[in-house]
Amino acid sequence: MSPFTADSLTARAGPRVRRAGTPARPTPVSPLRPPTPTRPEPRRPHRYAQDVNAGETQRAPWIVGVSGASGTPYAAAVLRALLVAGEAVDLVVSRASRLTLLDETGISFRDAHWRDDLREWLARGADGKPDTFQVDVDPVRYWNAGDLAAGPSSGSYPAKGMLIVPASTACVAGVALGLSKDLLQRAASVVLKERRRLVVAVREAPLNGQTLRHLVALDDAGATVVPASPAFYAGATHIQDLVDFVAGRVLDAAGVPHTLYRRWEGELGGGSRDD
């Protein structure tokens, strides 16, 4: 009898190689265990509002930050003028500013109903009367101030610049020192490092040396400081006129056209001119 058996010959020859063009044998499937279905990869949520990439589908917005200083009518006037000018707006409302807004207007700004609350806020005049203005808030996107992973926290996020109206001394200090305790301060720091326009409408009186040094630091970093102090040469007859003047100066610093106040031409107060 030959010492070579069929099993030994197969073991020595190694695994059988399939010729080119020969169909592969199907993998046997146990009738007792069905094949495991392939699970689709979960979608990663977008960081952008409305589940879109703002840089690809929308024009670059102005970021408007509202801090806790008194002067929420200034912010409302700036927001209205930006929307009238056809600008897209990204809105960041700090926690402290919600308390100020509630105290000055009686409006509670809620994350879940921010669009309705914003519409009511912008419709109110500086004298507190509701339904003074009609405003379309659809071009506004709202970002929670606690979301440090939001779009405006990155330099790659498209933005024309940022307007902080009103700016509290705490907000001024945080931005001047490069802190990022919330999205408002982080967005301002990003705007500065990207060499975009930052307008800070500080609303405080009196100003001590520490705050003045912070304002100088912001100016040195490239920001424009606009004190929330109205002028009276434009013939103001209503509190809204005074608010609009400050809002207009903020927009002037940002380069946004508006018609909020009557500009000085040398004759507004009846003064004489040399002929």
Question: For each predicted feature, which ranges?
Answer:
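A cross-family phosphate/adenosyl-ligand binding-site feature
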Residues: Y48-L198, P206-D275
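Compositionally biased, low-complexity flexible segments
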Residues: F4-H46
